[in-house]
Amino acid sequence: MNFPSGAVMPEQLPSSRATARAMVMPLALAQFIASYAATNMNVAIGAIAKDLGTTVSGVQTAITLFTLTMAALMIPGSKLTDIWGRKRCFVVGLSVYAAGGLLAALSTGLPLLVAGYSLLEGIGSALMIPPIYILVTVSFPDVKSRARYFGVISGAGGLGAAAGPLIGGLVTSAISWRASFGLQVLVVAWIMVLARKVIDPARSGPTPRFDLTGAALSAAGLFFVVLGLLQSRTYGFAKSRQDFAIGGTVVIPEGSVSPVWLYVAIGALFLVWFFLHVRSSEKKGRDVLLPLRLFRDKVANLGLGTQTVQWLILQGSFFVVSVYLQEVNHDSPIQTGLMLTPATIGILAASAAAGRFARRHPQRWLIIAGFLVAAIGLVLLLVLVRAHAGAWRWVPGLLLFGTGIGTMLTSSVNVVQSSFPDRDQGEISGLSRSVSNLGSSLGTALVGSVLVAVKLPEGKPFAVALIMLLVITLTGLVIAVLIPQVTARTGQC
């Protein structure tokens, strides 16, 4: 039998379910720890600021820089998998991440915290996350197996994000915020031991050249776009809540258009420049960071659209509920983390069932069903917010919302990754992760702006924010309906 260029030979694939599980375990743990790192710091801000003799805003800046570093370097990091190899890139990312965690744990001031957490952990995440999804895609050729193991990884990521505030809060309260970083280092060390069982199917064809200019342009573009979205917490999304100054000179006065749009516009210009560079390079036959052919696939484009909406409503809803519970119900961060547990259970349960779902239903219908269930969950949460309901009444809405998210997250990733041959997995994986990061940032930016801008009695702004998220969820449902019924590569959608 002849195999097409870029195909994986059968002898390179996991030969049994036990082998497959041994391979997926370190990948899932890596996704867990990356998601954990993105959320656990929020409950330790005060303790870190006091211990390091810095300000709360300084620690918040470190958290922002972590997000920016990871978002900006995700696409270049994914391209390196084609040059270094997927497993090698994964292990290098783990090593850089562990070094960052150790430096952060031992930091004596804000500069070392930024170097360890913001930069090294951010770079490590950008290197280790893309290989996770590439390795699953190239190692499991059929859509049902991919769904099963993407479900495991999505569940691990959801658990890490949800458990971050809870575990981080408990560790910080019981021991120290430094112990939280130490815990990450230990987990990463364990992952590196387990990673020896990861199979990296050989990639056919010549090793591509790294497009340094494209990497710089894409990183700058994503950096400024995400920075703008994150700055909405300070300045607001539409109108600026305070003066925006550069070098002591007020550039945008309070009440004018928010500087968020200045950052986003700068980022958009860099991204336009990036795409012009890619088009010019492709015409000259040069290797590029992100081939334009990736954007000509209708299924993948719609799948990326659903991913954006999913992460937007996930982060946006968690943000709304978290702020509501702490500001209106006066719950502690740890209590808030416990209150979000039903959503986490829903995500985990649906992700664990992804393989069984994929055997019975097309991926397209799973995405549609996920949006419908998530919308019902949001409606229940909206009713509870308006009624100022007690704690236990939040369970059904959060459980349904989490179940909907878990159902469609795995399917959307599967649809996007399965739309391309093995030779394009590095690029599409980085693009997919970048889109997810943008969705997450946009979710908190939009919700934060609504909560500040809406001048209504206690609890009403939260209802408005949930209504906005419900409308966006229904928009995602429309996008999912537009996904074609069948694709040539996966055989189903």
Which residue ranges define each predicted feature?
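Transmembrane core module of solute transporters
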Residues: 20-69, 176, 255-262, 283-413, ...
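A generic transmembrane-helix signature of 12-TM secondary carrier transporters
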Residues: 31, 94, 100-101, 116-117, ...
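Multi-pass alpha-helical transporter architecture, strongest
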Residues: 195-196, 278, 468-493
